[in-house]
Design a protein with these regions (language model features):
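ER/Golgi luminal nucleotide-sugar-dependent glycosyltransferases, focusing on the catalytic module
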Residues: 1-289
Length: 289
């Protein structure tokens, strides 16, 4: 793969709470070879843009607006990722890193850039090792007009009726995509980022009115494309080392790291970790900082 002229990285951040933690994240990403693109959920309160700007001295920080009301399981999550990619891709960065506002880097930016310089061309996308379960297939094969985690009794009834009326409907039959699932955090090259943006209409057609499509759309698009060859077989596993992340789903949903986890994190060899909470345990955040 031919290297892009721009050797900078773009960090794409989706934030919705934890203001103090976000400030730490921005300060840890502040580096000459980074630009930072930040989307703040429309529901979020207490974010002072001027305070966030003060966290960045070496990078450029871009606030992506208008702000979306991002809802769990909703297409708005995919739309938010596209907003970030569409804002950043005209600059043709070397790598694009999708993160949430409650993630933190575990290495210095110099070490992170060295890793991606040495492994340029590899796409860091996590795929689950198995194919979709029937429940996961239903997320994309049916129209989910009420994609809420907590539904009231009327919404639950309407939701079940709508699925019953769709027993013979399978949206995936005419789809050009082979569906796969994985984490929605990634590090991808400019070539792939441009391809993802170019194919937005396909994603809109087959992922609008799905549930948790943010865990499926990128994996499905890449798996069905020539970029599949840039994915190592090691990426098809049920851990997050393939995207250089530490995420613990065994102790939580996912687990929020505490101060007692510090040695485990720094000795993991990974570049990033998810997730943290300034309100729950700021000591681990201060140690990483």
């Amino acid at each position: 793969m031919k290297r892009v002229k721009n050797n900078k990285h773009a960090y794409l951040i989706m934030a919705h709470n934890e203001i103090e933690l976000l400030k730490v994240l921005l300060s840890l990403l502040d580096y000459e070879r980074n630009d930072i693109y930040l989307h703040i959920d429309a529901k979020a309160e207490g974010f002072e843009i001027s305070e966030l700007m003060e966290c960045v001295k070496k990078s450029k920080l871009f606030i992506v607006e208008p702000r979306l009301d991002v809802k769990w399981g909703n297409f708005s999550q995919i739309e938010c990722e596209y907003r970030l990619l569409e804002r950043a891709t005209p600059q043709k960065y070397m790598y694009y890193h999708m993160m949430s506002g409650v993630d933190l880097p575990l290495k210095t930016q110099g070490e992170i850039h060295q890793f991606f310089d040495e492994n340029y061309g590899t796409e860091y996308i996590q795929f689950e090792s198995s194919e979709l379960t029937n429940e996961e297939k239903n997320r994309v094969s049916k129209y989910h007009f009420i994609a809420k985690r907590k539904k009231n009794i009327i919404e639950k009834i309407l939701y079940r009726v709508s699925l019953m009326l769709q027993l013979k409907i399978d949206r995936t039959k005419k789809s050009p995509l082979e569906y796969r699932k994985g984490a929605n955090w990634f590090s991808i090259t400019d070539d792939l980022a441009q391809y993802v943006v170019k194919n937005k209409k396909i994603i809109e057609k087959y992922f609008r009115y799905t549930i948790c499509g943010d865990e499926l759309f990128l994996q499905s698009l890449v798996y069905s494309s020539e970029y599949r060859k840039n994915i190592s077989e090691n990426n098809f596993c049920d851990n997050y080392e393939t995207i250089k992340y530490v995420i613990d789903w065994k102790r939580g949903n996912p687990y929020v790291f505490r101060e007692s986890d510090f040695e485990q994190l720094v000795s993991s060899g990974q570049l990033f970790a998810r997730k943290f909470s300034w309100n729950l345990d700021k000591r681990i955040v201060e140690k990483i900082k």
